[in-house]
Amino acid sequence: FEDQDEYRLGINYAQKYLSILEEKRKMQKDRCIAEMFDVKEIESAAGLPLPYVISVTARNDNDYMWRNYADNYNGVVLELDLSYLRGGYDYAILCKLEQCIYEDTYSDDELVDKIFQAYSDGGYAFLNTNKELFMGMLKDYPQLFVRFIAMYILAFFAPRIKRNKFKGEEESRIILS
């Protein structure tokens, strides 16, 4: 992920809203993952995979994007049919198309809902790929299972967060992990 400042912002958002979610839902201690979202620990974790992000906008007349990302208007337009890219698992690569979340655009309650959706999506993604393995892990080693969910959130929620000054981009991201 090229923009480390944005990624750190996303990690901090994940930690904040996971903490609120865990408290609000009175989650069991072994299901809580907010404390895992420490920027320094994540940055120093050897071998931790970073997501690949392709930034797109639905607006073909977005002057800001052309000026800043296409070498001062010198670029190409790539048209993609993203209707199938709602999220899925294929050949050990997870991919999702997600709208960016700009700072101060959503209320805390809305962000808690979004992080809960990411938490749920993570659990579903793993259970959907190898149900027997992950059900056994959830039963016998719940903390290990939620670590996988934490990695999912790190891959698919954190890269969505952007600073308000970029709101004009109206950006969505294809995230590969």
Predicted regions and their residues:
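Partner-binding and oligomerization surfaces adjacent to conserved cores of proteins
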Residues: 1-177
